[in-house]
């Protein structure tokens, strides 16, 4: 086997000693983290790339006439080594990055982009796929195989398979640059977010935080080897501590540090990177024959066109902003009643909104948290709902190696006792972990490859001090249910082909199962099962439950407006014309929000352009609207469950059979309508948020 240079420049052989050389012998082919070293990834990825290119060349140059088996099935079977490594590499770099892994990521990202070009821009290979596509009605394919053929043909066309050789060369250069810029953005943002942490030696500046929160902040400072207290930044604009901090100067400092984290004029400033990314994507779309990058990206999504997605969002803006303005008026009235002597600013919103909530509903976040202990929420909430709906059960596996000690592993069994999946959870915040929460696979399900799913969830909950419980906000609880909804989508995958399996669906469908699963967090058949005091085990008092339910639609104007602002901002960035000059991100952002009636001074976007990880680093470019689109689907879906008896095995099994197990094996619009029995609409979505439907602004 050839030698490849390691991250340090030394020559590293890829051979049997590398843990990725052969499929893992652990249960479910779980990654052997006890054997994997940082230096193992690069040689394995490079060997995997070379191997798949050889496999693709053999398929493309096969002298035999193309058949479904010798072309489409052969493509599905190719790349098993590179996929085996890359699934694990992506998981570890997202959740446990270090300098050596960062160097490896920088080096392999353009090579992996080139691999995709080597497949989808291969003229001989496309001719074989195209011939089969043109003759598809004569091939007697089963529905899933027909879907694979039609899907792959579309993907080849969208990737540029029909371009001239000269244009393919241009496209490859753009793809390589995009891969490099994406990696650079991720690296810069991780460092910028870490350096934006708020550090103080003055305990009085942190007045309002609980003793547990202060202890966690002291621990965080100690880990960074600084004196005092440290509050690290989450990926969103607003920060959770702003609900509690009574010192307005501290709130402003934290908010502005969050807002400007990647705009400090230093090496981690992302503005030049994102400006070029947006310009490059517009150029790429033009080369591929589309009016904008968004038009290209949405060609294989449920919405179909950016115009459809924007129209959908425009319909939500009036209701959202009207509610947000009403909420702002309530908050200003409270500030005035307290003789605050200042106008509401964005760093004040969460602090005073929490007070308004207390006044309106007599509800305090600190009253609620003791009833949401992480392990209890997981086992008696998340797992319980899944068991009641789908009959599955969970057993912790302490014998499966993990990449950091905080990670837990569970074996998931079906109702008949058969092994279904492995599931990992990595819930606590670390400085070397990307912000937010997500799900992905270490191993994907495929009957063709004989693999069962190995799925993981990652979050950024505050880690308690030693010996203390991890108490969650209800937003955190909802996040757990959300990400586990993605996990169920992956675990219930029951498809032949890996390309169509599990969460391998359009962005504006993939968030539907996850957001649907959020509903069970507050469902009356589930909530009492896990909402119990961590000290006494007593259930949450009925009076407190009622307050929580009544406050469910509180602050929804703000929440929907900040989400719409981010989604519209994303769409504006990705509908630029190809000849657009490099944009000034701050000016562009201001103008884009004003144009969409979303420039509310007290309601900033959930993400500003400079730290919008979803669209510059996580594959959601021209796709952040998907969260709202899927909210329409999931609220309609939960309404169906309520109308048909709620949390029952019959309902769960039907949903699993018709939606969760199907991956992308059918037209998803038809799949959804067949399950629901109707067209989706925004009425249940607005009802769930406590909003009134209003006509869009003109």
Task: Show which residues each predicted segment covers.
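Short His/Asp/Glu-rich catalytic/ion-coordination signatures at enzyme active sites or charged loops
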Residues: 25-40, 89-108, 131-173, 232-272, ...
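Short pre-active-site segment immediately N-terminal to the catalytic Zn-binding motif
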Residues: 462-481
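Active-site-proximal, well-structured secondary-structure segments within enzyme catalytic domains
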Residues: 148, 187, 192-232, 280, ...
């Amino acid at each position: 086997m050839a030698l490849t240079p390691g991250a340090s420049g030394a020559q590293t052989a890829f051979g049997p000693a590398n843990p990725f050389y052969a499929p893992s012998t652990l249960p479910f082919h779980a990654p052997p983290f006890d054997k994997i070293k940082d230096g193992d990834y690069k040689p394995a990825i490079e060997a995997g790339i070379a191997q798949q290119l050889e496999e693709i060349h053999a398929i493309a140059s096969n002298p035999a006439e193309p058949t479904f088996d010798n072309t489409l099935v052969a493509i599905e079977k190719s790349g098993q080594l590179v996929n085996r490594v890359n699934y694990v590499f992506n998981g570890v770099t997202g959740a446990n990055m270090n300098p050596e892994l960062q160097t490896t990521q920088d080096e392999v990202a353009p090579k992996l982009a080139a691999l995709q070009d080597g497949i989808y821009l291969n003229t001989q290979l496309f001719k074989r796929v195209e011939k089969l596509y043109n003759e598809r009605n004569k091939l007697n394919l089963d529905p899933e195989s027909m879907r694979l053929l039609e899907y792959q043909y579309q993907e080849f066309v969208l990737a540029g398979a029909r371009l001239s050789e000269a244009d393919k060369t241009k496209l490859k250069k753009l793809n390589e640059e995009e891969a490099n810029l994406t990696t650079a953005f991720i690296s810069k943002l991780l460092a910028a977010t870490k350096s934006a942490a708020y550090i103080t030696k003055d305990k009085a500046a942190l007045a309002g935080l609980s003793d547990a929160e202060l202890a966690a902040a002291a621990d965080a400072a100690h880990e960074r080897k600084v004196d005092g207290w440290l509050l690290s930044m989450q990926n969103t604009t607003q920060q959770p501590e702003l609900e509690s901090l009574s010192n307005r100067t501290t709130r402003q400092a934290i908010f502005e540090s969050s807002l400007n984290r990647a705009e400090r004029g230093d090496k981690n400033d992302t503005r030049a990177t994102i400006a070029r990314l947006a310009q490059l994507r517009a150029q790429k779309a033009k080369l591929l024959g589309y009016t904008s990058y968004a038009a290209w990206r949405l060609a294989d999504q449920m919405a179909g066109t950016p115009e459809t997605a924007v129209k959908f969002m425009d319909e939500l803006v009036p209701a959202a902003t009207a509610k947000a303005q009403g909420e702002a008026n309530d908050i200003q009235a409270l500030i005035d009643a307290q003789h605050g002597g200042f106008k509401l600013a964005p760093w004040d919103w969460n602090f005073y909104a929490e007070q308004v909530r207390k006044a309106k509903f007599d509800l305090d976040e600190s009253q609620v948290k003791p009833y949401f202990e992480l392990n209890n929420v997981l086992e008696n909430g998340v797992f319980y709902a899944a068991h009641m709906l789908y009959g599955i059960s969970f057993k912790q596996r302490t014998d499966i190696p993990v990449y950091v000690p905080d990670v837990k592993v569970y074996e998931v069994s079906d109702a008949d006792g058969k092994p279904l999946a492995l599931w990992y959870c990595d819930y606590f915040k670390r400085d070397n972990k990307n912000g937010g929460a997500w799900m992905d696979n270490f191993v994907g399900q495929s009957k063709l490859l004989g693999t069962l799913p190995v799925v993981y969830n990652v979050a950024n909950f505050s880690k308690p001090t030693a010996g203390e419980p991890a108490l969650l906000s209800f937003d955190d609880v909802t996040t757990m249910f959300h990400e586990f909804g993605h996990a169920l989508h992956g675990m219930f995958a029951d498809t032949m082909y890996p390309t169509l399996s599990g969460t391998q669906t359009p962005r504006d469908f993939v968030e539907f199962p996850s957001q649907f699963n959020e509903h069970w967090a507050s469902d009356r058949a589930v909530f009492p099962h896990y909402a119990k005091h961590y000290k006494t085990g007593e259930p949450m008092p009925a009076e407190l439950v009622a307050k929580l339910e009544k406050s469910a639609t509180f602050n929804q104007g703000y929440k929907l407006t900040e989400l719409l602002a981010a989604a519209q901002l994303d769409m504006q960035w990705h509908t630029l014309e190809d000849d657009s000059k490099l944009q000034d991100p701050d000016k562009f952002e201001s103008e884009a929000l004003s144009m969409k009636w979303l420039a509310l001074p007290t309601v900033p976007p959930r993400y500003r352009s400079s730290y919008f990880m979803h669209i510059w680093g996580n594959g959601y470019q021209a796709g952040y609207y998907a969260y709202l689109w899927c909210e329409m689907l999931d609220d309609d879906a939960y309404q169906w469950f309520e109308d048909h008896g709620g949390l029952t095995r019959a309902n769960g099994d039907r949903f699993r059979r018709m939606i969760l197990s199907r991956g992308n094996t059918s037209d998803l619009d038809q799949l959804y309508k067949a399950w629901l029995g109707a067209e989706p609409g925004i009425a249940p979505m607005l009802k769930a948020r406590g909003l009134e439907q209003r006509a869009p602004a003109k």
